Amino acid sequence: MKNAVTRGQPRALAEVESMILGRAPHAVMFVGPGSTGKTTLALDLAAGLLCGDPDPGARPCRECRGCHQVASGNHPDLHRLAPDGPGDQIRIGKAGDPEPGTVRHLINELALLPVEGGARVVIVEQAHRMNDDAQNALLKMLEEPPAGVTIVLCADDEECLLPTVRSRCARVRLGPVGGREIERWLGDLGVADAPRSARLARLAGGRPGLALAYAHSSEAERIRGEIARGIVDMLAQGRAARLASVRELTKSAAALDTALDSWRSAGLAAAAAAAAGPARGRNGKATKAATASAGALTAPVPAAAEDAPPVAANAAQDAAPVAAEDASVPRLAAADRRSAASTLLEIWASIGRDISVAQAGGGPQLREVELVDELRAVAPAVSPASLVSFLARVGEISNQLDENVGPELALDVLALSWPRTEAAANAPANAPAGHRR
């Protein structure tokens, strides 16, 4: 597909190209891991459908008024929804006067005629964050779509959507992107030099959107590095120190989320500008001034349930004596705490994976490039069996976070499950902290 911003998804791009050349379905779902380019691909499709070039094979041309309006986020017939507000959800909206950014407001917008008189495109970012009421309202539009409207749902996990919604959508699947492809892409955009592009491509783990966000925020990269080092340091810590450390790491993960979110818009804007050049015109509006992202890092869910699944519940007694949090520090909203927990969990799993790779002698495959020496040094002192058990526990706790288990309890369990180096494990219980290595 010519002039596509999306990289590393040849099969998905071929399917989108066929939609532009032929007749686009009234509803299509882009499914794949977060930050693999679903929103970027949706914008490529929107640019193609709203392009004014008379030759379908040349769309998107990236030169016409329509293409520039899509790139600048100002095309009047491109409508976007994204999670917002408490719980970070997409909501149905009030029945009488629905607020912008809700499904009912979108339905009202689509009841009007198109501004440009041609196709209209709806992009629902993080569609898995729609609550059931919003999905049922959207379902009516999927069953009886307005003429000329293509609805694109971007979802990390389609199982979060109602079966009736899924059944009315064509599927396009996206997977992780190769590290070399991400590295070249960052270089082409001019957002990072060659060494940094290579480092970020490894850190991203196949997610170009995440690499792009880090490229635009050295602060986010710095915070992530501090979190990674803190996790490695915990290998030598005792129980009480771990429970204190995980609280600080969670705060850092929340700061990382903020830094990444602040730059995702700039990241996708840079990618679009590289393909489309300077944007023209400021007319038109979107259904929601959604934050443009190449994919979400995490999928936070609403406030935690009181009952914890067995894995977390069984360790609750061990995790009980946690130091009280500083009352002067504002408590994060439930959705932000859950997002921070997911972010920390992801970095923790990456560190565990790298230690396992280092134990197998696979240095070139390590993702944490800045910690190569530390990881190689600590790998022989960590039990491979305990590491395998820990990585399995990460998967269990990740699922529990999706099921509304309390993030603080889940992270306490993980901290106590994190392997200890042999020296730390063999240290006397009453040994001074400075002598426990």
Model-derived segments and their meaning:
Residues M1-D133:
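Clamp-loader machinery-focused feature within the broader ASCE/P-loop NTPase space
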Residues M1-G48, Q69, A111, A147-V149, ...:
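Charged, glycine-rich active-site and insertion segments that engage polyanionic ligands
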Residues H75-L78, E116, V152, R166-V172:
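Active-site-adjacent scaffolding segments
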Residues G117-V121, P146-V152:
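Loop/turn-to-beta-strand initiation segments
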